[in-house]
Amino acid sequence: MDLTDTGAVVTGAGNGIGAAIARRLAGAGARVVVNDLDAGAAEAVAAEIGGGGVPGDAASEAGVPPPVAEAGAPLGGIALYVANAGVGVGGGPEAPEADWDLAWQVNVMAHVRAARELVPGWLERGQGRFLTTVSAAGLLTMLGSAPYSVTKHAALAFGEWMSATYGDRGITVQCVCPMGVRTNLLESSGDTGRAILSPEAITPEEVADAVMVGLADGRFLILPHPQVADHYAARADDTDRWLAGMRRLQARVFEGQA
């Protein structure tokens, strides 16, 4: 994908993975609009890369359309939309209803709402690219965090549906599925999340590097941690064996926290 003068929007780009992707895109010649709930953070990254900053709340139905509309005009149209905003919510069935709803709104419905705004124009033009930051949790699971795991699976499923439905009509859909990344989200993932993910955690810049490679080759799954492909294959090959392995991992983590 030639990014020269390409209009791109990156959500959740005030820091972490989103900011790193925005910097890489701008460095490759794209015209980038930085979107974040934190208006100051969005403006700071935008000023750094010579782009535009548009605040927006990916957790609300009214929060997605305005940034898409505001970004589209100065960019001359959005050719690449990076749905990166996400939220980590821990716990299991006992997690409060509000936590489950927040995870659903940010991790899933923000993608749906962005697609609702963008797809008609992309179909009319015959091209567009929709890239979502999912997580390896969407391919596997995340111990200690049912809302996060469930909504990331749903985000991946929506990406698969989008690709199957629109892939032959000019719309490329890609899902980025890293394991641990050294961001605020990792720090807030709780003792279980940190114990599992920290040993193999990579930087946001390494994720952005993988994204740039993925944009060039167009693959659906972008895996900054290559070992995720083996874990995903093992899960599909023998799900019961894989689940038994996850239970053993959970037991080791709990022993370490005792």
Positions of PLM-derived features:
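Conserved glycine-rich cofactor-binding loop
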Residues: 7, 14-15
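Active-site helix of classical SDR
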Residues: 115, 151
